[in-house]
């Protein structure tokens, strides 16, 4: 079976969804920009040699509809002979895109693929056109479709206090801002055209969603956002709304060597699981455990974790049940996470994987794990190994 390697991984800056940098930039353009950039950064691979493009996107309507993967590829002037497919596993869509490409390569049906994902939550809101089947309430609590309430449920079940959530959210912003200031994101962010507050076209090379002024004291003043009477989850401890895309060049190890391209990491194992929709945010725990089992590893073998921060109330129970509470500052989301950077749904899986690869290199660790919860009760995880 072929070894699957990541040759390159990049992302756009994360733009604020409400009147932000990409308010006049379409999702297809964000995607095409990264496709072009990956090919330009790796000229040894001819675009015509790509076997497929797998692109995650959740709200597949309006500008994100009608197979955005293909539309973006055409905009990027990828040869018409290269196919493209849009993947939807809600929050895990672009990580699923990676898994789909990896399996094609493992079986020998592909040698080189572009994978990634996008979500423009300013142009196509998360709730746009959502119409749950009324019969679902016979089998699943109606609140299971309300992500904030599932986070409230997890917080109550696991004893996660408001103070713990506020502290974690402040940490996310502080670490993301420190990473920005130190240049830690420089290797992954591709400058992307957008508009500043005055409408002037400019190149953005930083995440505009981060709030460096965030403090625990300020967060403590916010009202609960989803359960106004008994709740502890606020807008400040939830993932920000942002627009962005991320992309990776995935190849068989043999093809990368043929072309003289240096792999950055191998895909060591992959896992996806289901869980109770009412605690959808718990999905990373069984997904991570399954991925570790497939890799023949334990959590202690992992040098760095990237865990998507849907909510502080959601990620903290996952950290606790993976036995990592004492290692948060050494291993988990060292450059902040979605609370600070936002969670553009179809983008985030590739985004956290991209950040993870850079952290693995910077920390000089052998293994890294990226994992996410998924709306309606799923979890997805990938173990990477440095080459």
Swiss-Prot record:
Family listed: Belongs to the thiolase-like superfamily. Thiolase family.
Pathway per the UniProt entry: Lipid metabolism; fatty acid beta-oxidation
Coiled-coil regions listed: none
Active site as annotated: 91, 343, 373
Example of a GO MF term: acetyl-CoA C-acyltransferase activity
Broad class of enzyme this protein falls into: transferase
Disulfide topology: none
Protein name per Swiss-Prot or TrEMBL: 3-ketoacyl-CoA thiolase
Domain of life: Bacteria
Subunit note: Heterotetramer of two alpha chains (FadB) and two beta chains (FadA).
Subcellular location: Cytoplasm
A single GO cellular-component term on record: cytoplasm
HAMAP family: FadA
Record-listed E.C. numbers: 2.3.1.16
Catalytic activity: an acyl-CoA + acetyl-CoA = a 3-oxoacyl-CoA + CoA
Organism: Shigella boydii serotype 4 (strain Sb227)
Main localization, broad class: cytoplasm
Role summary: Catalyzes the final step of fatty acid oxidation in which acetyl-CoA is released and the CoA ester of a fatty acid two carbons shorter is formed.
GO biological process: fatty acid beta-oxidation; phenylacetate catabolic process
Alphabetic keyword roster: Acyltransferase, Cytoplasm, Fatty acid metabolism, Lipid degradation, Lipid metabolism, Transferase
């Amino acid at each position: 079976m072929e070894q699957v390697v990541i040759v390159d991984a990049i992302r756009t800056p994360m733009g604020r969804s409400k009147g932000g940098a990409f308010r006049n930039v379409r999702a297809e353009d964000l995607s095409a920009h990264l496709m072009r950039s990956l090919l330009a950064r790796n000229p040894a691979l001819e675009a015509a040699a790509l076997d497929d493009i797998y692109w995650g996107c959740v709200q597949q309507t309006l500008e994100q509809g009608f197979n955005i993967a293909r539309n973006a590829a055409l905009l990027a002037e990828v040869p018409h002979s290269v196919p493209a497919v849009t993947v939807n596993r809600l929050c895990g869509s672009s990580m699923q895109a990676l898994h789909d490409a990896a399996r094609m390569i493992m079986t020998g049906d592909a040698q080189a693929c572009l994978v990634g994902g996008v979500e423009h939550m300013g142009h196509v809101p998360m709730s746009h056109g959502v119409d749950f089947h009324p019969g679902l309430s016979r089998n699943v609590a109606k609140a299971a479709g309300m992500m904030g309430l599932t986070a409230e449920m997890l917080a109550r079940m696991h004893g996660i206090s408001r103070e713990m959530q506020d502290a974690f959210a402040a940490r996310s912003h502080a670490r993301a801002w420190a990473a920005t200031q130190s240049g830690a994101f420089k290797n992954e962010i591709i400058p992307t055209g957008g508009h500043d507050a005055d409408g002037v076209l400019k190149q953005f090379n930083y995440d505009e969603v981060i709030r460096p002024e965030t403090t625990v004291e300020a967060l403590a003043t916010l009202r609960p956002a989803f359960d106004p009477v008994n709740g502890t989850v606020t807008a400040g401890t939830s993932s920000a709304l942002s627009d962005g895309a991320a992309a990776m060049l995935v190849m068989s190890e043999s093809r990368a060597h043929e072309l003289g391209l240096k792999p950055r990491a191998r895909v060591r194992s992959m896992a996806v699981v289901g869980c109770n929709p009412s605690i959808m945010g718990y999905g990373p725990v069984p997904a991570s455990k399954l991925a570790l089992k497939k890799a023949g590893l334990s959590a202690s073998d992992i040098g760095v974790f990237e865990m998507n921060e849907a909510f502080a109330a959601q990620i903290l129970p996952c950290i606790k049940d993976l036995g990592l509470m004492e290692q948060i500052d050494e291993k988990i989301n060292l450059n902040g996470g979605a609370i600070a950077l936002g969670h553009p749904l179809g983008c985030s899986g590739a985004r956290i994987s991209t950040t993870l690869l850079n952290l693995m290199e910077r920390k000089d660790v052998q293994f890294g794990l990226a994992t996410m919860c998924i709306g309606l009760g799923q979890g997805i995880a990938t173990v990477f190994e440095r080459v």
